[in-house]
């Protein structure tokens, strides 16, 4: 894919239909390089389906998705990853049967964790993996199985493995789900550090404090439609939109 100036991501009247049900109904969106966008809304609003279409996991019923100047409708997820579109999931990524270091090594070499890591890695690759773990304060857990490390560490590893190849855009699905308030604070700081590196971030989140602290723009979806696109300040002042968001099992702390 060719690199172009302008928006990093564009969605033009994107829709996903399951029979008569419109899971996503004509959503249009333009994301500039370096922006951080938070998406909220009730369960079933279409947020994850929207993410799945952007990342190539779910075919688009109508409309077009453009990434870095190229139409990507129908492009396989692994091709999008290598073009610079990284995606994490609500269920923490990584292989629990592997150590933290093995997961990081697999991401360094293969682009995503896969079984069998830790067997044929050279010294430079191991040094790179350890450097990334140190950057995310995970080096002390390098020999621990992913299943044995704390929730915050698993979230950090999820991000570290996704950004090791410096993606142009990072899609995060509920990144602070299951974290305690103090851990959310630490993850907010991590997201702000990624913003400082120029990585474009688009995330789905139910924790309002995280949404408003991290995002440049807040989008709210409801019944498959985009009903709000504005600043965090505008979102907090819009009582109608907030009522939709707060009705979605949202955590405010």
What are these regions (language model features)?
Residues 40-42:
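The feature captures the beta-strand-to-loop junction immediately N-terminal to the Walker
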Residues 55:
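Helix-to-loop junction immediately C-terminal to a conserved catalytic motif
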């Amino acid at each position: 894919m060719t690199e172009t100036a302008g928006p990093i991501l564009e969605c033009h009247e994107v829709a996903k239909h399951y029979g008569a049900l419109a899971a996503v109904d004509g959503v249009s969106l333009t994301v500039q390089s370096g922006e951080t966008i938070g998406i909220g809304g009730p369960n079933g609003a279409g947020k994850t389906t929207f993410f799945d279409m952007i990342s190539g996991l779910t075919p688009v019923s109508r409309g077009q998705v453009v990434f870095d100047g190229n139409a990507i409708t129908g492009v396989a997820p692994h091709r999008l990853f290598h073009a610079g579109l990284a995606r994490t999931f609500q269920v923490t990524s990584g292989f629990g049967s592997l150590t933290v270091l093995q997961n990081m090594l697999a991401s360094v070499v293969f682009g995503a964790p896969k079984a069998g890591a830790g067997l044929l890695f050279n010294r430079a690759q191991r040094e790179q993996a350890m450097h990334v773990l140190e950057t995310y304060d995970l080096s002390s857990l390098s020999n621990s199985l992913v299943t044995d490390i704390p929730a915050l560490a698993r979230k950090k590893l999820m991000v570290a493995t996704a950004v090791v190849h410096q993606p142009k855009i990072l899609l995060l699905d509920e990144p602070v789900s299951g974290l305690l308030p103090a851990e959310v604070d630490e993850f907010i700081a991590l997201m702000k550090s990624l913003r400082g590196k120029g990585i474009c971030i688009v995330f789905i989140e139910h924790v309002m404090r995280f949404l408003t602290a991290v995002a440049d723009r807040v989008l709210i979806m409801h019944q498959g439609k985009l009903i709000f696109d504005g600043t965090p300040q505008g979102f907090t002042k819009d009582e109608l939109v907030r009522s939709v968001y707060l009705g979605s099992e949202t955590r405010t702390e």
